[in-house]
UniProtKB/Swiss-Prot annotation:
<keyword id="KW-0273">Eye lens protein</keyword>
<dbReference type="GO" id="GO:0004364">
    <property type="term" value="F:glutathione transferase activity"/>
</dbReference>
<dbReference type="GO" id="GO:0005212">
    <property type="term" value="F:structural constituent of eye lens"/>
</dbReference>
<protein>
    <recommendedName>
        <fullName>S-crystallin 1</fullName>
    </recommendedName>
</protein>
<dbReference type="InterPro" id="IPR004046">
    <property type="entry name" value="GST_C"/>
</dbReference>
<comment type="similarity">
    <text>Belongs to the GST superfamily.</text>
</comment>
<feature type="domain" description="GST N-terminal">
    <location>
        <begin position="2"/>
        <end position="79"/>
    </location>
</feature>
<dbReference type="InterPro" id="IPR003083">
    <property type="entry name" value="S-crystallin"/>
</dbReference>
<dbReference type="InterPro" id="IPR010987">
    <property type="entry name" value="Glutathione-S-Trfase_C-like"/>
</dbReference>
<dbReference type="InterPro" id="IPR036282">
    <property type="entry name" value="Glutathione-S-Trfase_C_sf"/>
</dbReference>
<dbReference type="Pfam" id="PF14497">
    <property type="entry name" value="GST_C_3"/>
</dbReference>
<feature type="domain" description="GST C-terminal">
    <location>
        <begin position="81"/>
        <end position="214"/>
    </location>
</feature>
<comment type="function">
    <text>S-crystallins are structural components of squids and octopi eye lens. Contains relatively little GST activity (1/1000 of that of mammalian GST enzyme).</text>
</comment>
<dbReference type="GO" id="GO:0006749">
    <property type="term" value="P:glutathione metabolic process"/>
</dbReference>
<dbReference type="InterPro" id="IPR050213">
    <property type="entry name" value="GST_superfamily"/>
</dbReference>
Length: 214
């Protein structure tokens, strides 16, 4: 059984789904995790500011979502057969679309995070409208998709938590901090996020993780 060290930043960004996947793995497989603060990793191993941080000693250019998929497949959170895997993928992709459009609102022209609203109000407004439209398009579909298994009272794949459920939690975490009523019309999704948050291994991670503004 291989072991891994997961490197990630102390912000709730695109790699958070990979971090959440890691918290559900048996303890013997995850040897350690290493949290970088912004500006710290550029001094490590001659990495540039824009470099992605990969898994262990593998290619450091692996995208963060690929890391989440890899961990989910490796340890059984990606569905039990090809049809389930396809379902987990399209649900995860939908939530990633929401997360990606949200993160774009905080990126400058070079795709670097600003962690503050853009001073270019026209650009910021256009990006926010895009994010809101993505939510209007995807959230009703995700609510209906969740209801297809056991009326939406468990997880997207029934009684088994998968990467799709973790993506629901991670992708909506920051948007809900800005707009707490965002899921008021989607009670099944809100209840699902609470189930993920209260999962025994997830809750312990959420309690001990670094508190950040973003």
């Amino acid at each position: 059984m291989p072991s891994y060290t997961l490197h990630y930043f102390n912000h709730r960004g695109r790699a958070r789904s990979a971090v959440c996947c890691s918290q559900l793995l048996v303890s013997s497989t995850m040897t350690a995790d290493r949290v970088f603060r912004m500006g710290q990793h550029e001094k490590q191993d001659a990495m540039s500011h824009d470099a992605n941080v990969g898994i262990g000693q593998q290619n450091p250019n692996s995208p963060e979502y690929a890391m989440a998929r890899y961990l989910a497949r490796e340890f059984g959170f990606h569905g039990r057969n090809n049809m389930e895997m396809a379902r987990v993928d399209f649900i995860s992709d939908c939530f990633y679309d929401i997360l990606d459009d949200y993160m774009r609102m905080y990126q400058d022209g070079n795709c670097r995070m600003m962690f503050q609203r853009s001073r270019d109000m026209s650009s910021s407004s256009e990006k926010r409208m895009r994010f809101q439209e993505t939510c209007r398009r995807i959230l009703p579909f995700m609510e209906r998709t969740l209801e297809m298994y056991n009326g939406g009272s468990q997880y997207f794949m029934g009684d088994q938590m998968t990467m799709a459920d973790m993506m629901c939690y991670c992708a909506l975490e920051n948007p809900l901090m800005e707009e707490p009523s965002m899921l008021s019309s989607y009670p099944k999704l809100m209840a699902l996020r609470n189930r993920v948050m209260n999962h025994s291994k997830m809750s312990s991670y959420l309690q001990r993780r670094c508190r950040t503004d973003f």
